[in-house]
């Protein structure tokens, strides 16, 4: 595609398979909503074997494809027909085509970093993504209906990108077709990933041959999709010292040459692309494209990490939480449907050893009886949701010094007892889904704070912000703080004017923590137009009881409120 004002030049290459000498009449017609926009035709004398033929089309007043949340996704159909000299049909193919311009710019204030800021059709796009895993271990078991539901849920969570992780496999045509239609950008990794043995990309000649064959087959199939944003050499690939691999690596250089030859899109050497592989506050200025952590850092430490982060792109991180009770009842026998941990219960360990949240949940909410499994799940999932929401909003408050967040992970390919997923194997959403959905709203009020668990009588420092990916907003923000019993402790209403695709930070404020099970701060954003409903963000802070823990009934009530 090449743009000139409001028109576009589309060029393509047809690959023809001839079985014998014959004259073929070829045509290509671009159609939009049933009406032909432009066409091309030619005749060619086929010979046995493979031939290629270039064609080009001029599209006046082209309609641009936009990522989700930033406009419509108009799709054209390219009809390619081959007929013999007697006008009998030899072959016919129909391709879906979308037109958009893509540029990659440096993140604000970044130096010596790869360009991670995505600009589509002249507008900077903050990446709000999730890491997508195959919903089944075998691709043959994945139906289009399953993908429609899964990707529809991702779109409803206000996501505009999926990262197809290098430890998975390249998806079916259905996957990319649905992303085209929904406006979900695709970060496509080649099929390489870190392992427990070695993260250095293989240089074995036979492996490199297979890698090249796979890439040569995949790139021409994927490159026609407007949703395809970029390629990556793979997941968490490094050199021998543990530094993220770059294009000097023989393996990665091979893939780069193939992308440059077969497509014109951006390619990252790997993800994380460094120079740090993992987010590290001790090495500021080196957290460009980073991964991790995948755990809730603690009732204070988690907030310190994300308040001080200087990541340019946070392409993989998460927080773990227990599976839904309905899922556990399908995979565990009755004797294992009890509160336990993965040190003591090998069945639980087999279904999620790395994601044991027992110690974390008990340290925040106190002890649980064996029969308190439902409450335990709700408290575990609440911390997962809270931790994710804070990380996403903290990164987004720094847009475009930070250019995107990609949650690990959206779904799971098999059922587990605990994990970092937002939707379980059976298609039921965890609490974290709803918190991510709110954090990714195009326009949403947000709150900066220092910790989750407080002593009564302490003073907490807070700062509200308005995060805006959309058009200019004019209205007011109402800040209210209430005790768990409903007593109004603080109220302030401010007129706000938020520029298009920019954030607005408001004046900090302080509140004395009440002698109550919890403090709730409501941020209510109201437009000057009475037509739009208010946008509300709710933040709950726990207070320590006599034993130093939070009252778990507060978390249980919040879980039940969101999951209704």
PLM regions and their residue ranges:
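Secreted/periplasmic carbohydrate-active enzymes, especially glycoside hydrolases
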Residues: 1-163, 397-398, 402, 428, ...
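Active-site-adjacent substrate/metal-binding segments within catalytic domains
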Residues: 63, 88-195, 204-230, 346, ...
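Alpha-helical structural signal in soluble globular domains
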Residues: 81, 174, 178-184, 221, ...
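Flexible loop/turn segments at secondary-structure boundaries
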Residues: 105, 134-137, 169-172, 195-196, ...
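Generic beta-strand/beta-sheet core signal
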Residues: 121, 128, 165, 187-189, ...
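Short, charged, surface-exposed secondary-structure boundary motifs
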Residues: 195-200, 436
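Active-site neighborhood of glycoside hydrolase catalytic domains
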Residues: 202-278, 427
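Substrate-binding clefts and catalytic carboxylate motifs of secreted carbohydrate-active enzymes
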Residues: 231, 268, 275-278, 295-474, ...
